[in-house]
Amino acid sequence: MKITSVFAGSVGMLALAATASASPYLGMSLDAVDNGGNIAGDTYRLYVDLESGARVDAVFGNSSNTLNIGVDGGSFIQSAFGGPTSQDINPNFFGMVPSLQWESFVTIGLLTNVDNALNNIGIDWAVFEAGDSLITDNGSWFVTPNDAQGAEVGGRVLIGQFTVSYGASLIGSVNIQGKDADGVTFQATNISWVPAPGALALLGVAGLAGRRRRR
């Protein structure tokens, strides 16, 4: 199925028709987090910054706006016990497999599979799972507008955790759809963030603001 204007999945349908109202999208931020040396790389969490009361329902790529998340100067680091989305991250195994908590995966709002309604469609994850770029022009990971995990917390929504080779940078651009505080649908396309060099991967270095683009 071609991903253009509508996503169809087992949890229902998510329209991608943007409105003409002002967007609640404010930018993107990239936080470096301390992985305690439990995985061989620098770990970052990628957020969408939003106005109060807004939410993210989908991160997508289509024929007009390709999604591309990659690494400059290295590769993604993965755990053999995880998978490409937060639905594959089971916290019951963190004690036995510490690297699982810090591997690379996409999400909306949550870091584990607990109470997680995340779904995905149309994405071939094989290249990403092998450590190379995540690219799609016909896919999405998403939640429905009724799922609480899409709501902003502290003005932002987590959309991915990425561990990269020491000294490498996370680069790329994504497209999102969500709703503002009044429930009006919006899109922000080809949005990006300031790449964080691995030298900054220290606890307390956070909130690198991406460029702002409204639609």
Residue spans of the language-model regions?
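N-terminal signal peptide c-region/cleavage motif recognized by signal peptidases
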Residues: 17-19
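Membrane-interface capping segments at transmembrane-helix boundaries
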Residues: 214-215
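Non-catalytic macromolecular-recognition regions in eukaryotic signaling proteins
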Residues: 23-193
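Residues at structural and domain junctions
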Residues: 8, 32, 148, 205-206
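Bacterial N-terminal signal peptides that target proteins for export
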Residues: 1-8
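A short, hydrophobic C-terminal helix/tail in secreted or cell-surface proteins
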Residues: 195-211
